[in-house]
Design a protein with these regions (language model features):
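Cysteine-centered motifs
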Residues: 19-21
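Bacterial N-terminal signal peptides that target proteins for export
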Residues: 63-72
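Bacterial N-terminal signal peptides
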Residues: 71-80
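Boundary at the C-terminal end of the N-terminal hydrophobic targeting segment
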Residues: 82-88
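N-terminal active-site segment of His-dependent metallophosphoesterases
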Residues: 88-179
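Extended active-site neighborhood of metal-dependent phosphoesterases/phosphodiesterases
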Residues: 91-116, 174-276, 298, 303-319, ...
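Active-site glycine-centered loops adjacent to acidic/histidine catalytic or metal-binding residues
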Residues: 129, 167-168, 204-205, 283, ...
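Short acidic, glycine-rich surface-loop motifs adjacent to enzyme active sites
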Residues: 165, 270-290
Length: 393
C-alpha cells in the first residue's frame, strides 16, 4: 500500500483533481461500505454510528486488517493532497480578482459613494503601451517584461492611489497565436503590484484590433474586464473609453452608439455630483497638439473628434490622458488638456521608456513624465503649481 501511495503521489496534479472528485462524491460511500464490510452487526447503522463503533473496536469488529488499513490510508491520501489547488487554478483566481475588476461599467476596487467626496490631494501613475512583443516583432518579450517589472518596482515604492495603463497591453491581438503568452506575461508582471494599489487596464488597438468587433472586445474582456467604464477617487470622476471604436466603428457600430449614450449619462451625473475634476482615459489621443489638426494614424478622425470635444468641453472635463503615440505630446482644447504619454515599452521618439505621475489637487492637476531611470524618490503633494507643457518629441 505504501508503494501504491508513492506512485499515486508522483502523478501530482492529476491525482489532486481525482481526489477532489472523490472527496465530494465517492469517498463518503466508500468509507460507509468499508465500515459495513464483513459484519452483520454493522448493517443498518448510520455513518456516524459506524465511525464511532469502529473507532472503539477497530479491525476486531469483523473487518479485515487489510481492508481497514486500506480505508485509513486512502483517507490520509485524500486529506493530504485533495485540497491543494493547482498552479493554473491559482493563476485563474488571480486574473479574475485583479485584472477583471472593471465590470458592469464600473471598477470594483473603489466605493463610489465614499469616493465621490473630495478628501485630500493624491497622485496616480499613468502608463501606456507596455506592448509585450513590440521590440522583436512578436518573437519574444524579454525587454518589455524587464521594463514592466521596473515600473512595478517604482509603483510599489511610491504607492500611488491607483495605476492606470492606457492601452496596447500586448503587441499581438486576440486572434494571433502569441496573444495568450503575452497576456500571461502581463498578468504575471503586474500581479506583483501591491494588492492595495488598484490596477486599471484600458483597451488599445492592439488589444481589440484596429477594426474592433464584438468578438474581439469579448476576448479582451475575458482577460481584462470591461472595455469602457467609470470610477470615482477622492472626489474625482474618472471615465475610461474604448477609443478604438472611435477610431474605426465599422466593425462594431452598436458598441460606439452604446458608449456615446453611456458617456453622456456619466458626464451629466458627474456634474450633478459636483465632481472636483472629470478626467478621461483612453488609448488613442483625440489630437496630438491642435484640436483641429488633420486626420492621421495617431489621432481620432475629425468626424467623431469634433462632436466629442464639444461634449467634453460642455461637461468641463479637466484633461484627457492617452498613449498610442509611443512618445509624449501635449495640446489644449479650450481649458481642457490633451495629454499623450510615452511608452513603458518600445519608444518611437527621443523620450525614454517610462510613465507619467499625475498629482491631483483640489483646484488643479500637475503631471510629469519620467524615464525609468529618472523617477523621483518621493512625491511632494504640497506644491500646487501649474504643469509646464512638455516639449513634443
Amino acid at each position: 500500500m505504501a508503494r501504491q501511495l508513492r506512485q499515486i503521489k508522483a502523478h501530482g496534479g492529476a491525482f489532486q483533481q481525482f481526489c477532489r472528485c472523490v472527496v465530494s462524491r465517492a469517498l463518503p460511500e466508500l468509507v460507509f461500505s468499508v465500515l459495513q464490510e464483513g459484519h452483520q452487526g454493522n448493517k443498518g447503522l448510520s455513518a456516524p454510528q459506524l465511525l464511532h463503533r469502529n473507532h472503539e473496536n477497530g479491525p476486531a469488529n469483523g473487518i479485515s486488517m487489510r481492508t481497514y488499513s486500506s480505508a485509513i490510508l486512502f483517507l490520509i491520501a485524500t486529506t493530504m493532497w485533495a485540497p491543494k489547488a493547482s498552479a493554473a487554478d491559482e493563476v485563474a483566481a488571480e486574473v479574475n480578482g485583479r485584472f477583471k475588476q472593471a465590470t458592469n461599467r464600473t471598477f470594483k476596487a473603489f466605493n463610489q459613494q465614499r469616493e465621490q467626496t473630495w478628501q485630500q490631494p493624491f497622485f496616480f501613475f499613468q502608463l501606456a503601451d507596455t506592448q509585450y512583443g513590440m521590440f522583436t516583432g512578436n518573437k519574444g518579450f524579454e525587454k518589455e517584461a524587464a521594463l514592466a517589472q521596473q515600473a512595478v518596482k517604482h509603483i510599489n515604492r511610491l504607492r500611488p492611489r491607483f495605476v492606470i495603463v492606457c492601452g496596447d497591453l500586448t503587441q499581438a491581438s486576440p486572434e494571433q497565436a502569441r496573444y495568450r503568452a503575452q497576456v500571461a506575461q502581463y498578468h504575471q508582471d503586474f500581479s506583483k503590484v501591491d494588492p492595495e494599489i488598484p490596477l486599471v487596464c484600458v483597451c488599445g488597438n492592439h488589444d481589440i484590433g484596429n477594426r474592433p468587433t464584438p468578438k474581439s472586445i469579448a476576448s479582451y474582456s475575458e482577460n481584462f474586464g470591461d472595455d469602457y467604464f467609470s470610477f470615482w477617487v477622492g472626489g474625482v470622476c474618472n471615465v475610461v473609453l474604448n477609443s478604438s471604436v472611435l477610431k474605426d466603428p465599422t466593425g462594431a457600430p452598436e458598441v460606439l452608439a452604446a458608449q456615446q449614450k453611456w458617456l453622456e449619462q456619466q458626464l451629466r451625473s458627474a456634474k450633478a455630483a459636483k465632481a472636483r475634476h472629470i478626467l478621461l482615459f483612453q488609448h488613442h489621443p483625440l489630437f496630438l497638439t491642435k484640436e483641429n489638426e488633420p486626420d492621421q494614424y495617431f489621432n481620432i478622425p475629425l468626424a467623431r473628434r469634433t462632436p466629442l470635444l464639444d461634449q467634453l468641453k460642455r461637461a468641463d472635463v479637466r484633461a484627457v490622458f492617452a498613449g498610442h503615440y509611443h512618445r509624449n505630446a501635449y495640446g489644449r482644447a479650450g481649458s481642457m488638456e490633451m495629454i499623450t504619454t510615452g511608452p513603458v515599452g518600445k519608444p518611437l521618439g527621443k523620450d525614454a521608456s517610462g510613465f507619467r505621475i499625475v498629482i491631483v489637487h483640489k483646484a488643479n492637476i500637475q503631471h510629469q513624465y519620467y524615464g525609468m531611470d529618472d523617477v523621483p524618490k518621493t512625491i511632494d503633494l504640497t506644491k500646487a503649481t501649474q504643469t509646464v507643457e512638455p516639449t513634443q518629441q
